[in-house]
Amino acid sequence: MSGAALIPGARYAFGVVHPVAPMLRVRYRQGVPVDPYGFPDWTPYARAVIALPPLPPGIGVDEARVLDVLTANLAVPDPTDPDASGRTPAGWVWAHLARCRRVALVPAELHAALRHLGGVSTGDADPRRRGLPVDTTAPPPLRFTERLAPAVVSRVEQRLGVALPAGYRDFLARTNGGWPAWPAVHPRFGFVVDQPLFGMARADWMQDLCHANASLTDRFTADWLAIGHLQGGLLAVRVAGGDEGSVWYWDDDDPRARDDDTAADVGDRLLHRCADSFGVFWHDLRAVPGSLRDLAAVAMAGGRVTRVEDERTGSALPPARRQPAP
């Protein structure tokens, strides 16, 4: 329809979209193909593509995303997960392929770099049904590998040009970007926390707090600091402009998003406030609902989850990331 608002990525229909950040344009130099409807085809950057069964009737969009992540991780378990907790391999996220029941395991930084739709918001889930039916009362234990010296944290603030809010600053100093011991969810939203959050001096510089934010300037103004990838988007803290220290969620499949949205638009109307502080945010996290775990297990046991064989799978990944899927 003439004058209708375009979905994110629509301008690239029938073409290829490249990340804005120069660092990512070099790493993923072939770009991501876009279908006639403006949805990205992640297959060339996938370590695995999984075909999922139809969604249960009446399931909400938040439940649908969590269910799909759980099911895909049962099909492609992470061999580095000592507890077999069902988490996604670090540095990777599950991306929905549009207009079908398939998900692709793709690099988290590439998925976050491109504004797009094509996920659960365009599927059969009920958009009016939000939130998750959590059935536990305790937050996840925090895992980490190292602490940061106070001088290092001060240098981080100098590089970023902002004073980190106290709650998040303490988390960064104590864990250098820790992660939950098991996949965690927030009762009000449809994301899964199963990745290490951004830290410093990471082996992959796109997991580095400073480098990662340099690639997200089209997403966040200077009032916000991205602090990690989620299955379902990005986590950010507010660092300026009032309400400093609050934690926010950017949904990477938000149907309200438009192709011409700026970083200011994202901050004004596309972020979801999760908590007053990072400590409160972590305390609100819960284990994945047992009802969704059961649905994923039944689908696997019934043979309704299959690995898709496609010669294009992973064909555009950098050589260092083309190892077989875990």
Predicted regions and their residues:
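Nuclease and nuclease-like effector domains acting on nucleic acids or nucleotide cofactors
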Residues: M1-V93, L97-A138
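Structured loops at beta-to-helix junctions and adjacent beta-edge loops in soluble globular domains
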Residues: P53, A108, G228-L230, V239-A240, ...
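Short, surface-exposed beta-strand/loop "edge" segments at domain boundaries and coil↔beta transitions
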Residues: P57-I59, R102, G233-A236, D254-A264
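Short, well-ordered loop/turn elements at secondary-structure boundaries
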Residues: R87-P89, R99-R101, F220-A222, L230-G232, ...
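Short, surface-exposed beta-strand/loop micro-motifs that present aromatic residues
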Residues: A95, L234-A240
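A surface-exposed partner-binding patch
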Residues: P133-L234, S315, P319-A325
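Compact, glycine/acidic-enriched structural inserts
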Residues: W248-V288
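Charge-dense, low-complexity intrinsically disordered regions
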Residues: V298-P326
